[in-house]
Amino acid sequence: MSLKSIVRELREMRDGIGSMSRRAADGRAGGGRGGSRHSWPVLWSEQQQPPQQQQLQRQEHQQQQGRWANLPPELLLDVIQRVEASEATWPARRQVVACAAVCRSWREVTKEVVKTLEECGRITFPISLKQPGPREHPVQCFVRRDRATSTYLLYLGLSPSLHGENDKLLLAARKIRRATRTSFVISLVSNDFSLSSSTYVGKLKPNFLGTKFTIFDSQPPCDAVVLPNNRPSKRHFKQVSPRLPLGNYNVATVSYELTVLRNRGPRRMQCTMHSIPALCIQEGGKAPTPTGIIHSLDEQVPALSTSKGKEPAIEFSSTSLSADLSGPVCTNEVPLVLKNKAPRWHEQLQCWCLNFRGRVTVASVKNFQLVASVDPSLGIPAAEQEKVILQFGKIGKDIFTMDYRYPLSAFQAFAICLTSFDTKPACE
């Protein structure tokens, strides 16, 4: 039997597994693309379900999986390795996700075979969006902007395909306008931006002038000190899953330089990545790399005292987990700071220019490249400091490219790029 036949049979079997899982998938907005269990939002939400519900689903799955759940480990490993090696790009890559959805044993083997994004350079599971990109080459993506709905869609690939059928959606964001403020809500799907949804992955909040932005992650980063903020967030939940952490986690701050004289020129920005240590970019350094969804805040940090109906906004420092949440910020490691790569003025074109290596074709104030800004005392090689970690630029009407690499994740890079779309009266 060929590998494609095996995967096809697995998908047919998977579609018939468990009316409970089907009802769970159909009940979630955005998770019903064909109702398949291997869709990203469903896999994300399944890992955040209560233990009792997961146990019931596992028992039901075991009764219906038959011979596939009892394959010899050596054969199972060989099958998944072959599928992983042959299906390297999307949409064929969904076959690897299908293998992880067969049963618990298949999922464990698939998790062993599929390496982190930094190691293999391939985006496979939703957790890949929170992992650092590869070191040797950037992950190339593009962003579509819908002005009518203030929606921004991040896709994997060099540029949009002709009909868009094979474009792999990674993340979606929507600009939410309030009476006194605005924010960007980031989700796994393009039709559900509820803060209480299982597809919610984070948000971006600007200040009034549009000069400072705070990036909040829905999950606490690994290897971080948690420091409660005195001003709790005002997000209210109608119904909160016991597996979801009650908090937004301040993982980065993006600041734009205030332009008093309103002189024309490129925007100047600085990104402080609170959850990434600066030393991670040196040879042998390691950025925090999550390998699975964190099920509950209680598994990582002690409970935080909150006001009724409110949740704490939590800040991080790039150090080991601390039990004393009320103490001062522990700064054993300096956070990574990113800055604009200095452009050059082109006399003939009469504009500021950067070498985007063909990935940006339209001049725009939104175009930028970010490199590391480190203290000389840290001993980071000059070559590492010159590497472009994130670049963003325009290629057409409402279409932009976004290329990122280690140590940024897709979520962090996308959130930084979203700051370019907000109004900045004090910076222009």
Curated annotation (Swiss-Prot):
Gene3D superfamilies: 1.20.1280.50, Tubby Protein, Chain A. It comes from the Eukaryota. Signal peptide: none annotated. Residues 47-65 have a biased composition (Low complexity). Residues 17-65 are annotated as: Disordered. Residues 65-117 form the F-box domain. SUPFAM superfamilies: F-box domain, Tubby C-terminal domain-like. Ubiquitous. Belongs to the TUB family. This is Tubby-like F-box protein 5. The gene is TULP5.
